[in-house]
């Protein structure tokens, strides 16, 4: 299996778990499940985290489960998820749509933590809530993030104390809707940032299906977000009828 194929499988598993973790964190944790339950029993499958090898490929057991991986809560290993930093925290944890992109290292390479941090600062991202990076509304950080960026490797956060030792095959960018602006405007903020990050890190931009992001896919996402905005726009005000 090629390095890019392994990266895509890793993103498939870790990306889903990461997004769910960031927005489900803080809810009561479910009791750990001690065994894998057969589908015939009609019980939920055991939740397992992806196992990433030292070469940043997904090991066989996780690869076999890639197709059926669930969006489950990711264990943050007991650390304070916010690190005492509320910058980039969503004022409302409810969401109904997530749009994600990835910047992956080229075959045989990795993204170094120190380089990721420098690139993030150059593109206007700020370090904050959940120990990940966020793009905020200028002058209104209290409105929450326009989009966020995290590592695809467990636990997804950036440990600044050990950032020089950090390496990851890819980073994830996710736009969670509703956002502090229209969905289309938020996308137009995220896309050039992701593309610039890829340039700075000498990486490649992948879509949510782990394929190279192309013009056709970009156009399709824009159409989806226009439709989302139409569905969620406030109804027009009507005058009260005169009797």
Swiss-Prot record:
<dbReference type="GO" id="GO:0005886">
    <property type="term" value="C:plasma membrane"/>
</dbReference>
<keyword id="KW-0472">Membrane</keyword>
<feature type="topological domain" description="Cytoplasmic">
    <location>
        <begin position="26"/>
        <end position="243"/>
    </location>
</feature>
<comment type="similarity">
    <text>Belongs to the ZipA family.</text>
</comment>
<dbReference type="InterPro" id="IPR011919">
    <property type="entry name" value="Cell_div_ZipA"/>
</dbReference>
<dbReference type="Pfam" id="PF04354">
    <property type="entry name" value="ZipA_C"/>
</dbReference>
<feature type="transmembrane region" description="Helical">
    <location>
        <begin position="5"/>
        <end position="25"/>
    </location>
</feature>
<keyword id="KW-0131">Cell cycle</keyword>
<keyword id="KW-0997">Cell inner membrane</keyword>
<dbReference type="GO" id="GO:0000917">
    <property type="term" value="P:division septum assembly"/>
</dbReference>
<feature type="topological domain" description="Periplasmic">
    <location>
        <begin position="1"/>
        <end position="4"/>
    </location>
</feature>
<comment type="function">
    <text>Essential cell division protein that stabilizes the FtsZ protofilaments by cross-linking them and that serves as a cytoplasmic membrane anchor for the Z ring. Also required for the recruitment to the septal ring of downstream cell division proteins.</text>
</comment>
<feature type="region of interest" description="Disordered">
    <location>
        <begin position="30"/>
        <end position="89"/>
    </location>
</feature>
<protein>
    <recommendedName>
        <fullName>Cell division protein ZipA</fullName>
    </recommendedName>
</protein>
<keyword id="KW-0132">Cell division</keyword>
<comment type="subunit">
    <text>Interacts with FtsZ via their C-terminal domains.</text>
</comment>
<keyword id="KW-1003">Cell membrane</keyword>
<dbReference type="GO" id="GO:0032153">
    <property type="term" value="C:cell division site"/>
</dbReference>
<dbReference type="GO" id="GO:0043093">
    <property type="term" value="P:FtsZ-dependent cytokinesis"/>
</dbReference>
<dbReference type="InterPro" id="IPR007449">
    <property type="entry name" value="ZipA_FtsZ-bd_C"/>
</dbReference>
<keyword id="KW-1133">Transmembrane helix</keyword>
<keyword id="KW-0812">Transmembrane</keyword>
<dbReference type="InterPro" id="IPR036765">
    <property type="entry name" value="ZipA_FtsZ-bd_C_sf"/>
</dbReference>
<feature type="compositionally biased region" description="Basic and acidic residues">
    <location>
        <begin position="35"/>
        <end position="50"/>
    </location>
</feature>
């Amino acid at each position: 299996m090629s390095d890019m194929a392994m990266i895509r499988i890793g993103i498939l598993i870790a990306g889903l778990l990461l997004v769910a973790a960031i927005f489900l964190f803080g809810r009561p944790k479910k009791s750990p499940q001690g065994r894998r339950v057969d589908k015939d029993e009609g019980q939920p499958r055991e939740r397992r985290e992806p196992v990433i090898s030292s070469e940043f490929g997904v090991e066989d057991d996780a690869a076999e489960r890639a197709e059926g991986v669930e969006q489950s809560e990711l264990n943050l290993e007991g650390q304070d998820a916010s690190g005492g930093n509320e910058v980039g925290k969503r004022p409302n944890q409810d969401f109904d749509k997530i749009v994600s992109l990835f910047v992956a290292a080229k075959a045989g390479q990795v993204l170094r933590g120190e380089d990721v941090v420098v690139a993030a600062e150059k593109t206007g991202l700020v370090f904050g809530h959940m120990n990940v990076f966020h793009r905020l509304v200028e002058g209104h950080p209290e409105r929450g993030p326009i989009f966020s960026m995290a590592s695809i490797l467990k636990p997804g956060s950036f440990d600044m104390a050990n950032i020089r030792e950090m390496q990851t095959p890819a980073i994830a960018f996710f736009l969670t809707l509703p956002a502090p602006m229209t969905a289309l405007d938020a996308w137009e903020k995220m896309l050039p940032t992701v593309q610039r990050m890829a340039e700075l890190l000498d990486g490649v931009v992948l879509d949510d299906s782990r394929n190279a992001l192309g013009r056709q896919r970009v156009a399709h996402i824009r159409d989806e977000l226009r439709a989302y905005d139409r569905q969620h726009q406030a109804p027009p005000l009507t005058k009260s009828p005169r009797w």
